[in-house]
């Protein structure tokens, strides 16, 4: 019975020796697979083998993570606001913005005012004539610019345009002082040398008028000598008046007047 069953099994399924083997057909299969799919070797290199132990990790390899609580964003914002103070910071920010706006407004107004003043002063300085400026020769140039309501630089520029190289304030004041000294000498001398002193005064007045018209004109040599003689006479009179008696002071004044008179006579010549 057993032999019969074995015989049927061998007839149906074949013997073990004649069993189908993949090894016998491996060369054919590999040749056909290479012809059908030329990238088969590349896939073998890139894809890992299914039997590798690193392909899938076991569940036991994962560590148990602790339970994490969700982060409260509201509480974090509340902490930040409590530290820095949201209300005070916004107030400071608004104050800073308002101060910055005020400063920008003041700077813009100052710039606009400066432009308007420069434009107005430039227009005024261009309309100034030499006759108008000559009325302010007897005061310093800074005061003249203030009186004319223009800048000092613009006044100097306008003077250069009109041919006035140097402001004649000191020159005219020196000449005015010389005229006053000659007038005092005329009072001291009396009627003796009245004509000569009057002629000297007339010449000095003419020279003053010419300097007003031509500010760059220099003094004459006779005017310089007369000015120096009057200065020396006044200095001697002041020095001896406090040191000596009235008799000596009168004599010294007479000598000083005589020296100045000699200079006046030289001025007439």
From Swiss-Prot:
Gene Ontology CC terms, in alphabetical order: nucleus
Coiled coil: 175-216
Ranges of residues in domain RWP-RK: 106-195
GO molecular function, one term: DNA-binding transcription factor activity
InterPro entries found in the cross-reference section: RKD-like (IPR044607), RWP-RK_dom (IPR003035)
Keywords for this protein: Coiled coil, DNA-binding, Nucleus, Transcription, Transcription regulation
Region described as Disordered: spans on this chain: 230-269
Keyword Coiled coil: yes
Biased composition (Low complexity): 249-269
Cross-referenced Pfam families: RWP-RK (PF02042)
GO BP terms, alphabetized: regulation of cell division; regulation of DNA-templated transcription
PROSITE patterns per UniProt: RWP_RK
Subcellular localization: Nucleus
Function: Putative transcription factor.
Name of the protein: Protein RKD1
Gene source species: Arabidopsis thaliana (Mouse-ear cress)
Gene name tied to this protein: RKD1
């Amino acid at each position: 019975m057993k032999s019969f069953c074995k015989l049927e099994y061998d007839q149906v399924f074949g013997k073990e020796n004649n069993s189908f083997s993949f090894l016998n057909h491996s060369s054919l299969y590999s040749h056909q697979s290479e012809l059908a799919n030329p990238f088969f070797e590349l896939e073998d290199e890139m894809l890992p083998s299914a039997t590798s132990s690193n392909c899938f990790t076991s569940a036991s390899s994962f560590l148990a993570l602790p339970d994490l609580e969700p982060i409260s964003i509201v509480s974090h914002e509340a902490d930040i606001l409590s530290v820095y103070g949201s209300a005070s910071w916004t107030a400071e920010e608004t104050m800073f913005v308002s101060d910055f706006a005020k400063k920008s407004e003041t700077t813009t107004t100052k710039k606009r005012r400066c432009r308007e003043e420069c434009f107005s002063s430039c227009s005024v300085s261009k309309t100034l004539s030499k006759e108008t400026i000559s009325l302010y020769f007897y005061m310093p140039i800074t005061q003249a610019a203030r009186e004319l309501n223009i800048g000092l630089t613009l006044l100097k520029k306008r003077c250069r345009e009109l041919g006035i190289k140097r402001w004649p304030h000191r020159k005219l004041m020196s000449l005015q002082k010389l005229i006053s000294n000659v007038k005092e000498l005329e009072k001291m001398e009396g009627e003796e040398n009245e004509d000569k002193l009057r002629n000297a005064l007339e010449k000095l007045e003419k020279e003053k008028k010419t300097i007003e018209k031509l500010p760059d004109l220099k003094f004459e040599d006779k005017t310089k000598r007369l000015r120096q003689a009057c200065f020396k006479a006044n200095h001697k009179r002041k020095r001896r008046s406090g040191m000596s008696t009235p008799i000596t002071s009168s004599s010294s004044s007479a000598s000083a007047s005589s020296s100045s008179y000699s200079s006046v006579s030289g001025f007439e010549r």
